[in-house]
Design a protein with these regions (language model features):
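Membrane-proximal extracellular/periplasmic loop immediately following the first transmembrane helix
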Residues: 2-76
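Pocket-edge structural micro-motifs
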Residues: 17-18, 81, 109, 215
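Basic-flanked hydrophobic alpha-helices used for secretion and membrane insertion
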Residues: 33, 49, 58-62, 87-90, ...
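Alpha-helical transmembrane helix bundles of large polytopic membrane transport and channel proteins
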Residues: 65-72, 76, 84-99
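Short hydrophobic beta-strand that contains or immediately precedes a catalytic carboxylate
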Residues: 76-80, 105-107
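Conserved short beta-strand edge segments in small beta-sheet-based binding/regulatory domains
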Residues: 212-218
Length: 219
C-alpha cells in the first residue's frame, strides 16, 4: 500500500471548500456546508456522489517514536474522516476495532517529506522511507467529555491530494459520540465524485457558489 501512489482517492474526486475571506472571518461567517447546500450539490448533473469530511470534535495529541533510531516526536493533531467508499485502501486494513485499540491512519505524504528534509536533516536523525513508517509507533491520546484515553495509531497509507490526517468513519463516529457527545460535526469540506472532471459546468457552479477546490484541480 505504501508504494502504490495515493491511498486516499481516485482522479474523479474533487475536494470542495468554501472560499474564506478576511471580512467573512471577522464577521463570524461560517465556512461549513449546510444540509441544503450538500443536497443542491448532489442534485447537479455533473455529480455522481457527495461525501462529507467529518472533523474530530475532541482534543487529540500524538507521540511518534522509533526506539531503535532514537526518534521521539510529540504534537497536537486533528483528525478527519470520509465515508469508506472514498478511501482507496483495502478495507481489511481500514477498520477500527475498539477491542484492539488500534486506529488505522492515512497521512499526507508531505508530512514525511517535511520530517525527512527538515526535521531529520537539521537534527542528524535518520530519514524514514514510506515502508519504514509502518514500523513507527503512534501513541494517540484523546481527551473530551471528562475522559482521557490512549490508543495506538497504525499508518496504513499516504496521500498526495489530502492535507489532513484521515481515520476510518467508524472510528470517528464512535470517538465523537464518546468524547464530544454534546457537539455536532459540521463539514467544512466535501468530497465530490464527478462524471467528468473537465466538465466546465463544475467550474461555473463552483464560481457561482463561491466554492473552491483543494489543489485547484478545476483550473
Amino acid at each position: 500500500v505504501f508504494t502504490e501512489g495515493d491511498s486516499f482517492m481516485k482522479k474523479d474526486y474533487i475536494i470542495a471548500t468554501k472560499k474564506i475571506s478576511t471580512l467573512g472571518s471577522f464577521a463570524g461567517k461560517s465556512n461549513t456546508f449546510s444540509k441544503d447546500e450538500i443536497k443542491d450539490l448532489k442534485a447537479q448533473p455533473f455529480t455522481k456522489g457527495v461525501g462529507a469530511f467529518t472533523p474530530s470534535l475532541f482534543k487529540v495529541s500524538a507521540g511518534l517514536g522509533m526506539q531503535e533510531a532514537g526518534i521521539r516526536l510529540s504534537t497536537e493533531m486533528f483528525f478527519e474522516s470520509v465515508p469508506d467508499e472514498y478511501v482507496d485502501v483495502s478495507l481489511d486494513k481500514w477498520h477500527f476495532d475498539e477491542d484492539t485499540r488500534i486506529i488505522p491512519i492515512i497521512v499526507p505524504r508531505n508530512y514525511l517529506n517535511l520530517y525527512n528534509f527538515g526535521f531529520a536533516q537539521s537534527r542528524s536523525l535518520p530519514k524514514l522511507s514510506e515502508g519504514l513508517m509502518s514500523l513507527v509507533q503512534m501513541d494517540i491520546m484523546m481527551r473530551g467529555n471528562g475522559r482521557v484515553e490512549q490508543y495506538k495509531g497504525n499508518i496504513v497509507g499516504f496521500s498526495n491530494r489530502l492535507n489532513t490526517i484521515l481515520v476510518p468513519q467508524s472510528f470517528m463516529d464512535w470517538a465523537n459520540k464518546n468524547f464530544a457527545p454534546e457537539k455536532e460535526a459540521e463539514p467544512s469540506r466535501l468530497i465530490v465524485e464527478v462524471k467528468n472532471p473537465t466538465d466546465t459546468a463544475i467550474t461555473d457552479y463552483f464560481q457561482q457558489k463561491n466554492y473552491e477546490t483543494e489543489g485547484n484541480n478545476l483550473d
